[in-house]
């Protein structure tokens, strides 16, 4: 922050190079108060000074200073956990508290959970998935941070996470929150509660998590990697080295799971992998781990980032380090675009709305619609 005037005035600067203030927002000169982006104040979670560039806390600080200047130092400032939100085209991204990167920098132990849940009930029109990641203490489940990427309803969910973090709540408090529910606005199991349930399962030992970085670095010759999705989903793309044993067939195919290796399970978003892990554990298997966030998170996290010059040719890829099999998508994009451009205008479009359908619903609906396509028709899915 620009604190040159403060330095010239002889006021104390903190270790983050912000204006150092006390709980009443007084500077080193008791007659001078300071608020806003240029002050540094201890973070409620780390108890270490930090800079918070947000308008909400700044305005609250101004109210506190006004009260203290008029009535004497009676109101203290408790600090901000840093709740922010931004709109990027049609998407909304939001965060509160400390993400994994900040926790690592601070040397704080943590666990994390990632879910993909609908913005409202799936049977009500226009439900869209949001991805939520929370970080929490492995000791007592204290909620440390939350991040959300989605379309609708991101704002109200991040506000709920923020309140739990601000009041030193735990992932168990997420399960107990009472939200307004009706199908257009939420689900009977709100995404905030679902995040709490997943974190609770990790803490209780009901599910041993497998994080995408661990899977990326794993020696697959020493583990059994199992895709528990349907055969149709598996055929559309799977992780290299995975065998397909659908969740519904597991009990009949139990002998296909080797007992002498750890079993790594994954599905689309994590739910079926969790159910499959319980089946294996109840049948005496030792180390069984479920990929947190499922294939959706793994593909998003390991996809190569395009370079600026590649935006004009999105079909090319400069990296093959991902374990995701992209062989179905390796055709020359320019040729495909030329062919498509010449034939699409004359085709009849069949539109399929798969919004709000939980997996494997969209895949099954797409497959059924493809089977019903007549010659000269094209399929559009949203």
Where are these regions (language model features)?
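Short, surface-exposed connector motifs at secondary-structure boundaries
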Residues: 142, 258-262, 372-379
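Domain-level signature for proteins that mediate thiol-based redox and metal-cofactor handling
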Residues: 326-382
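Generic hydrophobic alpha-helical segments
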Residues: 161-162, 215, 263, 369
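Short, glycine/acidic-enriched loop or turn micro-motifs at the edges of active sites
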Residues: 40, 230, 249, 356
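Mid-to-C-terminal Rossmann-like scaffold of FAD/NAD(P)H-dependent oxidoreductases
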Residues: 38-152, 183, 187, 191-217, ...
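A short, polar/charged loop-to-alpha-helix boundary motif
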Residues: 152-170
């Amino acid at each position: 922050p620009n604190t040159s005037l403060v330095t010239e005035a002889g006021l104390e600067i903190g270790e983050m190079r912000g204006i150092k203030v006390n709980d009443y927002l007084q500077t080193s000169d008791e007659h001078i108060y300071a608020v806003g982006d240029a002050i540094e104040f201890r973070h409620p979670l780390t108890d270490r000074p930090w800079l918070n560039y947000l308008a909400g806390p700044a305005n609250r600080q101004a109210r506190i200073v006004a009260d203290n200047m008029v009535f004497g130092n009676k109101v203290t400032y408790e600090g901000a956990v840093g709740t922010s939100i931004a709109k990027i085209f049609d998407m909304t991204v939001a965060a509160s508290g400390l993400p994994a990167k900040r926790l690592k920098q601070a040397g704080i132990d943590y666990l994390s959970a990632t879910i993909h849940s609908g913005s409202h009930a799936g049977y009500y029109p226009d439900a869209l998935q949001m991805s939520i990641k929370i970080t929490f203490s492995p000791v007592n489940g204290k909620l440390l941070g939350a991040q959300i990427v989605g379309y609708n309803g991101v704002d109200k969910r991040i506000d709920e996470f923020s309140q739990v973090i601000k009041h030193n709540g735990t992932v168990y408090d997420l399960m107990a929150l009472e939200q307004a529910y009706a199908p257009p606005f939420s689900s009977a199991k709100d995404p905030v509660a679902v995040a709490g349930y997943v974190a609770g399962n990790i803490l209780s030992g009901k599910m041993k998590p497998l994080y995408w970085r661990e899977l990326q670095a794993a020696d697959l010759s020493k583990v059994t990697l199992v895709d528990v999705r349907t055969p149709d989903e598996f055929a559309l793309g799977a992780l290299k080295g995975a065998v397909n044993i659908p969740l519904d067939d597991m009990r009949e195919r139990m002998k296909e799971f080797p007992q002498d290796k750890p079993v790594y399970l994954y599905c689309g978003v994590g739910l079926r992998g969790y159910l499959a892990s319980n089946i294996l554990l109840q049948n005496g298997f030792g180390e069984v781990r479920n990929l947190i966030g499922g294939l959706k998170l793994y593909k998003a996290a390991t996809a190569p980032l395009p370079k600026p010059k590649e935006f004009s040719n999105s079909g090319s890829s400069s990296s093959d380090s991902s374990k995701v099999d992209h062989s179905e998508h390796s055709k020359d994009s320019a040729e495909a675009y030329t062919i498509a451009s010449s034939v699409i205008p004359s085709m009849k479009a069949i539109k399929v709305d798969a919004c709000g359908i939980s997996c494997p619903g969209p895949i099954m609906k797409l497959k059924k619609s493809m089977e019903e396509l007549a010659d000269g028709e094209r399929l559009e899915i949203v």
